[in-house]
Structures are given as structure tokens and as C-alpha cells.
Amino acid sequence: MSGSNTAISRRRLLQGAGAMWLLSVSQVSLAAVSQVVAVRVWPASSYTRVTVESNRQLKYKQFALSNPERVVVDIEDVNLNSVLKGMAAQIRADDPFIKSARVGQFDPQTVRMVFELKQNVKPQLFALAPVAGFKERLVMDLYPANAQDMQDPLLALLEDYNKGDLEKQVPPAQSGPQPGKAGRDRPIVIMLDPGHGGEDSGAVGKYKTREKDVVLQIARRLRSLIEKEGNMKVYMTRNEDIFIPLQVRVAKAQKQRADLFVSIHADAFTSRQPSGSSVFALSTKGATSTAAKYLAQTQNASDLIGGVSKSGDRYVDHTMFDMVQSLTIADSLKFGKAVLNKLGKINKLHKNQVEQAGFAVLKAPDIPSILVETAFISNVEEERKLKTATFQQEVAESILAGIKAYFADGATLARRG
């Protein structure tokens, strides 16, 4: 009897040990599987971006299929979950590149994503390390296969940027302004730069107002005003919810031979007390204040947040910084002061003078460039104002008034090569 009990106890012990071993192996296997936490699709006329965010860096393979044209991405060590299943619903009917998408568990270790296309594309895939609240990201950008044949300067610059050819595509800096009356010899060319876009939302207010949205609205209003001026021509670095690298923004201004560059933003700080409008210009000798330095650092992080492929990293610290002319910075300060004076008539000023710091987006060596912080989106009252059509229109009108005042004070046009 006792021998029988001993045998039963031994069997139970072995069964328990086996169960514990299986549980342990199961937990190890589960821990080794990457967890996809978000999928985002950003369609735009220039390119469509698909972002897969996960708790671990993803291993992937990409290939193409024909009849119909498809891009296939296999992600290893991932299990299909509700986040991945929801990707198909994110494909918009007006996406220029993706017709539809489907996701499935291809084998026990692999999830397969299949994108049916509306046109031939050049896919580019790269990984982004965690930054600013984002986890590991796998990014797929879909560019049109005939990109070089299209008459879209921004698209061409994006292509050049991602191939590492941006430098030789940008016209060289000129020696200085050319004499002549602005708007009389030729139209004044103005490049508007709505900050952030796509993955990079910019600052977000208490009530979830996103900087990238309000600054695009302000830029569109300003564009409409400038288009009514007979002696001005206007371009925008982006007119969609799309990520544009900082150096591409600068390069587009140079390619369009802009006379002025205006980057539009909505300020934020760690506390909700600061308020008011500000204007910034470039400095090659350090920031004029701690706040200006902090702001430049946060704005310059846009490429890390928005997502720049490794092939473009060489341009982030380009020697363009060393080429900036002191004359251009002096003109930027004059231009900034003219705009700041006009902003002071419609909103409190955070600082009464134009501040300076090393903003990457202001580094065009031959174009007077300013960064306008329209208001503090982190301030609850100013967040409310930023959402209103009235305040947006007032800001747009103030910037245009500043542009006119700058040229009325004797500013000359940028030299044309």
C-alpha cells in the first residue's frame, strides 16, 4: 500500500515538474515574441508612409509581387494581434499608392503584410530607435517608381535625400543680396514652412490640440493672403499631414530660390504658465537664452521623431551650418523684428526681441529665415485661441504685414544665380 502511494506521489511529482517545465518554456517563447503596439498609415501626394511600432526591434524581409502589383513585408517573431488586423481599415480610398492591405499569420513565427498598389512604387524600409514616447518603429515609405519624371520639386528632393544625393541637387549659396526694389524687378518669393507633420505631431495641448494641425491651418491662411498680392509668389514645404525632413525643407526653399523663409510653430513648455508670441533667427554662436536653446533642441529633434532613414543621416549635421553668412543672419534679425512688431499688436509677446539659437530649419546660407512661435499651445488659454479661425487669421495677417514692413524698410531681394 505504501509502495503504491509512493509510486503515485512520484508520478504526480514528475507530472508537476513536467508542467512547470512546459510553462517555463512557454513563458520564454512568449517573451521572445515582439509585440506590435501600433500601426499608422500616412498617405500623401508625395509618398505614403506605413509605421509599425513594437516593443522590440523588428526583423523583416520585403519583396514585390506582380499581377496585381504588390509589396510584401514579412515580419519575424511576431504574432498576429488586433493591432495588426486593424491595419487594413486604415487604408484610405484617396491614398495615391495603396489600394488595399491585408495581414495574416504566414507561419508560426511570421506575420505577412501585403499591400496591393495603385501604381508602381519604390519602397524604402528602415528602422527607427525609440524616441520621444515612441517605441521601436519599422517604417516603410512608398515613392512613385517614376519619381524622377514628375514635376514635383518636393518629391524630387525627397528622392534625392533618401538616395544621399541631396547635396549636389541644391544650388550653391550666393554671395549676398542683389540691389533692386523688391516686387518691382521680380516677385518676392516666400517659402512657408508649417512645422512638424506625419509621425511628428509637434507639441500637444492639454485638450489634445496638435501643433502640426494648427500651424498648417495658419500657413494655408497666410498663403491665401500672399496669393492676393500682385508682387509676391508663395510656396509651402508641406500642404498635407506629411513628414518632411528638416534639411529637405531648407533645400526646397533653395530650389525655389526663395527670398524669405518663414517656419511656423506653436510653442510649448514644461509648465502651462508661459504665454505669448515669439520670433527666432539662427545663431552660429550659441543661443541667446536657455529657453531659446531648449526650443531649438526640441525643434531639431523633429527628424528623429518624424523618422529619417539612415541614408539621410549624413545631412543632419551638414557643413551647411558653417556656410551661413553673417549678412543673412543680420537680415533675418531685421525681418524677424518686423514680424515681431506686428504680432505684438494681436497677442502678448513672450519676449520683446528676436531670439537666436541653432535651429536646423533656419540654416539656408542665402535666405533670410525666421521661426515664428505663434503662441504657447501648452498654455490652456492660448491653446483655445490657436484653434479659432479668428486668431489664426490674425496671425497670418500679422506675418504678411511684417513681410511688407521688412521690404518697405529697404530690404533687397536674394541674389539669383
UniProtKB/Swiss-Prot annotation:
Catalysed conversion reaction: Hydrolyzes the link between N-acetylmuramoyl residues and L-amino acid residues in certain cell-wall glycopeptides
The record's account of how the chain is modified after translation: Exported by the Tat system. The position of the signal peptide cleavage has not been experimentally proven. Can also be exported by the Sec system.
Main enzyme class: hydrolase
InterPro entries found in the cross-reference section: AmiC, AMIN_dom, MurNAc-LAA_cat, N-acetylmuramoyl_amidase_3, TAT_signal
Enzyme Commission no: 3.5.1.28
GO CC, one annotated term: outer membrane-bounded periplasmic space
Family note: Belongs to the N-acetylmuramoyl-L-alanine amidase 3 family.
Name of protein: N-acetylmuramoyl-L-alanine amidase AmiC
Species per Swiss-Prot/TrEMBL record: Escherichia coli (strain K12)
